[in-house]
């Protein structure tokens, strides 16, 4: 990962401390996915509810191993792919140390 985003293919992912789930608008970002059958919606800043099309996961290799991204919500109407800092840390047994110009994932 880089200081502000990580790239998978041509798509950037941005760390977000305010989201509970990872979010993507591109189904191709998920290696495993299933249709979302619930009625839940992703609530955004203006209180608008965005429909969830699918739920899935993917993993990302790093120099020290691999990181998993579970319960990624596929939301067609979002414009930026977001990594939930809280979920990432819980799923991977890590914490993230933020610095002015970069961040470090630690276990």
Report the location of each language-model feature:
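Anionic group-binding determinants
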Residues: 1-107
